[in-house]
């Protein structure tokens, strides 16, 4: 997950089991890459009417701040359990955790978030945070969910777009670091997002189009296998719905890597929808790679 002189992994925490898992993953990433770890917690005053008449009564601010500090201290201990000598920095702030993570992503190597929070409302909130961060961050975002199936492959979704090229780069780096095989999956459904729900629809594919799609995958991978000769690569091309195929692969992958935007127009919207679906439903951790900034 290389980017220009960024030397930190940033993780957002809320005290939930999901965020504890995110801290462990973030600490592992930081350790493997010799980076420092920044753990952040956004103070949430919404339940107490931030700025309202109850804000200053009963020591609400002090209580929420103390709770936030305790969450950060516990997260720091989680990180030290992974690596006792890791460089860890913690910080509290008031406001939107999603916006804060997006701001910090400007200078981070990678941002890590959990996929669910503490309780139903928090789970919905953290899920929204994950979607917002993966949609707007300036660096790759790891959404920790499901199981990192030990011994499974790193799986990357490929569609031939510039963002997909960045996802391929991240996927090869991760596969090499993890000594894992890489599965490059190209799923196309140019006849529309629901066209291939009926298996008979495959007969509608124009002659030669399937060969063109195999060429898209081959061209996308050109040069990468030479750069990473240690990575065993398997290529898979499907005429299907991208979301369904990638979700199926997530059941046996240790990591799923996708771009957040596709080839533009309809396909761009489709891949954006696909990445959001994976953030919300994949069975393994997901890395969402953002487009290059103009």
What are these language model-derived features?
Residues 128-147:
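Short, structured interface segments
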Residues 33-36, 86, 139, 180-181, ...:
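Short glycine/serine/threonine/alanine-rich loop segments
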Residues 113-132, 151, 255-281:
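Glycine-rich, Arg-bearing micro-motifs that act as flexible, cationic patches
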Residues 2-58, 153-207, 225-236, 294:
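Small/aliphatic-rich secondary-structure junction motif
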Residues 1-5, 18, 59-62, 77-111, ...:
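Structural beta-alpha unit
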Residues 19-22, 26, 30, 105, ...:
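Small-residue (primarily alanine) positions within well-ordered alpha-helices
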Residues 112-115, 140-146, 287-290:
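Short beta-strand elements of ligand-binding domains
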Residues 57-70, 203-213:
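A short acidic, glycine-rich active-site loop
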């Amino acid at each position: 997950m290389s980017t220009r002189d960024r030397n930190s992994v940033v993780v957002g925490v809320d005290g939930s089991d999901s965020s504890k898992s995110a801290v462990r993953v973030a600490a592992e990433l930081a350790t493997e890459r010799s980076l420092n770890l920044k753990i952040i917690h956004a103070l949430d005053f919404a339940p107490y009417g931030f700025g309202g008449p109850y804000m200053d009564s009963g020591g609400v601010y002090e209580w929420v701040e103390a709770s936030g500090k305790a969450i950060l201290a516990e997260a720091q201990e989680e990180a030290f359990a992974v690596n006792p000598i890791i460089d860890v920095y913690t910080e509290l702030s008031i406001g939107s955790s999603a916006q804060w993570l997006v701001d910090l992503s400007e200078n981070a190597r990678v941002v890590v978030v959990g996929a669910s929070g503490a309780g139903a409302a928090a789970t919905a909130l953290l899920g929204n945070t994950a979607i917002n961060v993966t949609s707007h961050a300036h660096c790759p975002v790891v959404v920790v969910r499901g199981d990192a199936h030990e011994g499974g492959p790193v799986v990357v979704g490929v569609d031939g777009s510039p963002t997909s090229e960045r996802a391929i780069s991240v996927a090869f780096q991760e596969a090499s670091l993890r000594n894992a095989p890489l599965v490059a999956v190209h799923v196309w459904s140019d006849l529309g997002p629901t066209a291939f729900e009926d298996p008979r629809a495959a007969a509608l594919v124009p002659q030669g189009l399937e060969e063109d799609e195999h060429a898209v995958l081959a061209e996308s991978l050109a040069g990468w296998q030479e750069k990473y000769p240690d990575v065993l690569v398997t290529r898979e091309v499907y005429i299907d719905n991208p979301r369904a195929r990638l979700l199926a692969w997530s059941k046996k992958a240790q990591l799923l890597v996708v771009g957040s935007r596709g080839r533009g127009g309809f396909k761009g919207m489709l891949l954006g929808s696909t990445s959001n679906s994976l953030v919300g439903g994949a069975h393994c951790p997901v890395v969402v790679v953002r487009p290059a900034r103009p």
